[in-house]
Amino acid sequence: MIIYRDCISQDEMFSDIYKITEVANGLCLEVEGKMVSRKEGEIDEALIGGNASADGPEDCTEATVITGVDIVMNHHLQETSFTKESYKKYIKDYMKSIKARLEESKPERVKPFMTGAAEQVKHILGNFKNYQFFVGENMNPDGMVGLLDFREDGVTPYMIFFKDGLEMEKC
């Protein structure tokens, strides 16, 4: 399994159990999720390879059911909010941080990143009202903000992450 971490906060943002597509000329990763309902404290068996029928009967106790997007719930992402103006300030500072990291580690990515990022930010601001914003579990204000939107069907959630702001970790 591959875990994708925010390169600034080191928070786990998502893993390769989801359908991942490069978008915006390879600048971003689009991660498709699904809406799920879980009892509070319950672990999704798909994540651990469990089999409920083999584990024996479950205790019947009242439990709180939580419904949400699997990417958000599985990786403990925290919702945050922005106005258009506050997002512009955040993204400007975030782009500077990523540019500095790229200059050190992958100088050949700086120009394509900065050019593509400007276009992507325009697209994000143009569709600003469609997005919900999520940060990693530690809620680092300098870290990556994932954008949650829904497909045209209104049912299928997907998140967008800047690829150059992620580190991959094999588990």
From Swiss-Prot:
Expressed by the venom gland. It is found in: Secreted. GO terms for cellular component: cytoplasm; extracellular region. Residues 1-171 form the TCTP domain. Its main location: secreted. Keywords: Secreted. One of its GO terms (molecular function) is calcium ion binding. The keyword Secreted applies. It comes from the Eukaryota. Pfam families: TCTP. SUPFAM superfamilies: Mss4-like. The keyword Signal does not apply. Belongs to the TCTP family. Secretion of this protein from cells may proceed via an ER/Golgi-independent pathway, probably mediated by secreted vesicles called exosomes. Venom protein that causes edema, enhances vascular permeability and is likely related to the inflammatory activity of the venom. This is Translationally-controlled tumor protein homolog. It comes from Micrurus fulvius (Eastern coral snake).
